[in-house]
From Swiss-Prot:
Residue positions binding ATP: A69, Q70, S71, G72, T73, G74, K75, T76
Reaction it catalyzes: ATP + H2O = ADP + phosphate + H(+)
Quaternary assembly: Component of the eIF4F complex, which composition varies with external and internal environmental conditions. It is composed of at least eIF4A, eIF4E and eIF4G.
Homology family: Belongs to the DEAD box helicase family. eIF4A subfamily.
All copies of domain Helicase ATP-binding, residue ranges: 56-226
Organism: Aspergillus clavatus (strain ATCC 1007 / CBS 513.65 / DSM 816 / NCTC 3887 / NRRL 1 / QM 1276 / 107)
This enzyme's EC code(s): 3.6.4.13
Protein name, UniProt field: ATP-dependent RNA helicase eIF4A
Source species, domain of life: Eukaryota
GO MF terms held by the record: ATP binding; ATP hydrolysis activity; RNA binding; RNA helicase activity; translation initiation factor activity
InterPro entries noted in UniProt: DEAD/DEAH_box_helicase_dom, EIF4A_DEADc, Helicase_ATP-bd, Helicase_C-like, P-loop_NTPase, RNA-helicase_DEAD-box_CS, RNA_helicase_DEAD_Q_motif
């Protein structure tokens, strides 16, 4: 951590320039602790996102890092994985401190750290305003290895000497632009002054206004700068249809009738639960249809094999849960069937959207029961799109 007041380097506001472009494109090649790797795969990650491919390694190696990335790019897991790799679970003391602008975000980050660190026997405490100070103090005295919190409460706990900083290796500021614009500048500067000089600093921000750049110049040493543009998903070029299915029980027959059409090309069929994925796979297999299935309960090695077969084209139909919608690189898939409409509308675009640059054409077919009509209308409104009744000649469109 640098602490100098030299003149601000001339960095244009708004966007940083990357000075680092090394990419590590699989978690296996990051040389992570086996129990951390296990946690990453159990959490449902398959391969690192763009920011994870670029930022995890420099953080692990000890560089100060500035990453400019929007939410939805996988940044929480980026710094969670890095922090978990760097801490010593046997040392009962705070070794990584993560600051977030809101209590909700802090709690969300805590959940991710706990989930990914599931096999590591460590503690992660959320140190946030609005909770009982005494309980907070007690939890911090137990020496959780990772503390995530909001600036006000964290500063208070460090000043009371309850949150000890002598073993602190890593200080992470998430959504730095938000924190500074919410008036936490003074608290953040105070926290910096209270940390050991040797603390490594990682700063994440969607935008780079002047006040964020000032923090980077004052408190960071030769930072690695990484800019990750969010790839916009689009529904353009995708023909979206629905089939009215009166009852849930009729979906299976509807899908069987469609099977010939489906296998002209490769298709992904989405269900809302792992249980449903298994059930549907069993039912279709019993009817002599060839399908493969994938969800988060499976061992990573098993999922890799299934994905490989699907990518190579040797399996044609893949049944999956939402967990994998974000992880499946299905650019080659031209047909997606929502056996169940997604439980939340944001997932709709992850299931059927395409990276705009590829401009892939595709067809999406939604099975809609009477109970689903409202959700379908919501999806149409949310994306300003039209989902029309499926025509008879759908095979010609795929």
């Amino acid at each position: 951590m640098a602490s100098n007041d030299k003149g601000l380097e001339e960095i244009p506001e708004g966007q940083i320039e990357s000075n680092y472009d090394e990419i590590t494109d699989s978690f296996d090649s990051m040389d992570l602790k086996p129990e951390l790797l296990r946690g990453i795969y159990a959490y449902g990650f398959e391969r690192p996102s763009a920011i994870q491919q670029r930022a995890i390694m420099p953080i692990i190696k000890g560089s100060d890092v500035i990453a400019q990335a929007q939410s939805g790019t996988g940044k929480t897991a980026t710094f969670s994985i890095s922090a978990l790799q760097k801490i010593d679970p046997n040392l009962k003391a705070c070794q990584a401190l993560i600051l977030a602008p809101t209590r909700e975000l802090a709690q969300q980050i805590q959940k991710v750290v706990v989930a990914i660190g599931d096999f590591m026997s460590l503690e992660c405490h959320a140190c946030i305003g609005g909770t009982n100070v005494r309980e907070d103090m007690k939890a911090l005295q137990d020496g959780p290895q990772v503390v995530v919190g909001t600036p006000g409460r964290v500063q208070d706990m460090i000043q009371r000497r309850v949150l000890r900083t002598d073993q602190m290796k890593l200080f992470i500021l998430d959504e730095a632009d938000e924190m500074l614009s919410r008036g936490f500048t003074e608290q953040i500067y105070d926290i910096f002054q209270l940390l050991p000089q040797s603390t490594q600093v990682v700063l994440l921000s969607a935008t780079m206004p002047q006040d964020v750049l000032e923090v980077t110049t004052k408190f960071m040493r030769d930072p690695v700068r990484i800019l990750v543009k969010k790839q916009e998903l689009t529904l353009e070029g995708i023909k979206q249809f629905y089939i009215a299915v009166e009852k849930e029980e009729w979906k299976l027959d509807t899908l069987s009738d469609l099977y010939e059409t489906v296998t002209i090309t490769q298709a992904v069929i989405f269900c809302n639960t792992r249980r449903k994925v298994d059930w549907l796979t069993d039912k279709l297999t019993a009817r002599d249809f060839t399908v493969s299935a994938m969800h988060g309960d499976m061992e990573q090695s098993q999922r890799d094999v299934i994905m490989k077969e699907f990518r190579s084209g040797s399996s044609r139909v893949l049944i999956a849960t939402d967990l994998l919608a974000r992880g499946i690189d299905v650019q080659q898939v031209s047909l997606v069937i929502n056996y169940d409409l997604p439980a939340n509308r944001e997932n709709y675009i992850h299931r059927i959207g395409r990276g705009g640059r590829f401009g892939r054409k595709g067809v999406a077919i939604n099975f809609v029961t009477a109970d689903d009509v409202r959700m379908m209308r919501e999806i149409e409104q949310f994306y300003s799109t039209q989902i029309e009744e499926m025509p008879m000649n759908v095979a010609d469109l795929i």
